[in-house]
């Protein structure tokens, strides 16, 4: 018995590998500080839990949900989007669809639009699912390097015309995982122009839209005039509402994009449990003060890590958004894998290597701000005690 040949092209999922290494270390008795995965350690807000409890007690939530989400959920998602980004008029029946978090919807979008021989334009480094989903769909991906000299934004002019003509999807993710980079509306305007020129669907993974610091508010690509002609945006309750395990979000924007995704979803999944949708509606109604309090926690953690690494010689700027700090490895290490292995072996610290996010992630590692302050300070202390410093 043999698995499909496509699996030979797909490496082990980065975060599953992190979990495996964590479990092995814990089994050896190592006190692990796991800063490998962006899984918030704070609880889901009480009002969301209360809505969930009430919905579970309602027998009408116990049967199959609508494939594209309940009407109430899609209306609430569209209303939240309008309040947050100032862009309204999205029809809940044709321009909004529920999703099982973001990962499922991202993967299914590739199945909806990519045929064998088609190209997808993928940032590098990036969330690994963009690359693997291209392979599952039978397409080819063209890596767009995110380079410091371009403010970690892809250079669309560097995409060869022969590739652009065959491209079906252009993927973006700002605020960016893993780099923490942000994008302006001016950049998104260039993206929309490029997509219209080449008849490409822009897929903006905006999972970190609410995870920003120092008063910064990340934009939506759909704020650009004409963007809904070529773009869809993926949003999730996971990070902003501490609901990673609940698996609920939505996709909004271009009708063809939503229809294609919906056609795949109706044949693959059976929607989101209606009680979870009710809970998410309650989350959409939370005021900004709760989010500000949450982000104050993450901002303090960001400062602990950035200042701690600076004290060990790292040349870092504090990221404006996301739950991550993206940092270079010391030159004394030959690769990012070697460096993160040393952190695990010498310090009991788990972080992912940059090359797990693509070729242009080599030479970097990512720190997730999802452990308590005291454990972050302890991590810096362990690195100092082990003699791990940055040497340019």
Swiss-Prot record:
It comes from the Bacteria. One of its GO terms (molecular function) is L,L-diaminopimelate aminotransferase activity. Its cofactor is pyridoxal 5'-phosphate. Substrate binds at residues 13, 38, 103, 127, 177, 366. The modification N6-(pyridoxal phosphate)lysine is found at residue 239. CDD domains: AAT_like. Keywords: Aminotransferase, Pyridoxal phosphate, Transferase. Pathway: Amino-acid biosynthesis; L-lysine biosynthesis via DAP pathway; LL-2,6-diaminopimelate from (S)-tetrahydrodipicolinate (aminotransferase route): step 1/1. It catalyses: (2S,6S)-2,6-diaminopimelate + 2-oxoglutarate = (S)-2,3,4,5-tetrahydrodipicolinate + L-glutamate + H2O + H(+). Gene3D superfamilies: Aspartate Aminotransferase, domain 1, Type I PLP-dependent aspartate aminotransferase-like (Major domain). Pyridoxal 5'-phosphate binds at residues 67, 102-103, 127, 177, 208, 236-238, 247. GO terms for biological process: lysine biosynthetic process via diaminopimelate, diaminopimelate-aminotransferase pathway. Pfam families: Aminotran_1_2. The keyword Transferase applies. InterPro entries: Aminotransferase_I/II_large, DapL/ALD1, LL-DAP_aminotransferase, NHTrfase_class1_PyrdxlP-BS, PyrdxlP-dep_Trfase, PyrdxlP-dep_Trfase_major, PyrdxlP-dep_Trfase_small. Its EC number is 2.6.1.83. It is an enzyme of class 2 (transferase). HAMAP family: DapL_aminotrans_1 (MF_01642). Homodimer. Involved in the synthesis of meso-diaminopimelate (m-DAP or DL-DAP), required for both lysine and peptidoglycan biosynthesis. Catalyzes the direct conversion of tetrahydrodipicolinate to LL-diaminopimelate. Can also use m-DAP instead of LL-DAP as the amino-group donor. Belongs to the class-I pyridoxal-phosphate-dependent aminotransferase family. LL-diaminopimelate aminotransferase subfamily. This is LL-diaminopimelate aminotransferase. It comes from Gloeobacter violaceus (strain ATCC 29082 / PCC 7421).
């Amino acid at each position: 018995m043999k698995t499909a040949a496509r699996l030979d092209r797909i490496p082990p999922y980065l975060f599953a590998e992190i979990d495996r290494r964590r479990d092995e270390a814990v089994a050896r008795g190592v006190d692990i500080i796991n800063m490998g995965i962006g899984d918030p350690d704070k609880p889901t807000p009480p009002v969301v839990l209360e809505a969930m409890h009430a919905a579970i007690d309602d027998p009408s939530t116990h049967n199959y949900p609508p494939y594209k989400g309940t009407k109430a959920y899609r209306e609430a998602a569209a209303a939240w989007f309008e309040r947050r980004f100032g862009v309204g008029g999205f029809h809940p029946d044709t321009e909004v669809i529920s999703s099982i978090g973001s990962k499922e919807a991202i993967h299914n979008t590739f199945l909806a639009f990519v045929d064998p021989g088609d190209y997808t334009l993928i940032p590098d480094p990036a969330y690994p699912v963009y690359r693997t989903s291209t392979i599952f769909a039978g397409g080819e991906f063209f890596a767009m390097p995110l380079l410091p000299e371009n403010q970690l934004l892809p250079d669309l002019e560097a995409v060869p015309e022969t590739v652009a003509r065959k491209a079906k999807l252009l993927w973006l993710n700002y605020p960016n995982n893993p780099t923490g980079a942000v994008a302006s509306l001016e950049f998104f305007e260039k993206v929309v122009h490029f997509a219209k020129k080449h008849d490409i669907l822009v897929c903006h993974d905006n999972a970190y839209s609410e995870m920003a610091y120092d008063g910064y508010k990340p934009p939506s690509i759909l704020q650009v005039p004409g963007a809904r002609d070529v773009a869809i945006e993926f949003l999730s309750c996971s990070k902003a509402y501490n609901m990673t395990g609940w698996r609920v979000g939505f996709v909004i924007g271009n009708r063809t994009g939503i229809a294609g995704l919906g056609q795949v979803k109706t044949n693959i999944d059976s929607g989101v449990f209606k009680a979870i949708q009710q809970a998410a509606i309650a989350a959409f109604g939370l005021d900004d003060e709760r989010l500000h309090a949450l982000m104050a926690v993450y901002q303090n953690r960001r400062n602990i890590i950035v200042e701690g690494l600076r004290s060990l010689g790292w040349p870092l700027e504090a990221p404006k958004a996301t739950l991550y700090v993206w940092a270079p490895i010391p030159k004394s290490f030959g690769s990012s894998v070697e460096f993160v292995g040393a952190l695990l072996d010498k310090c009991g610290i788990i972080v992912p290597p940059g090359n797990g996010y693509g070729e242009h992630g080599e030479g970097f590692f990512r720190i997730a701000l999802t452990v308590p302050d005291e454990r972050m300070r302890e991590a810096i202390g362990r690195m100092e005690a082990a003699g791990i410093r940055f040497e340019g």
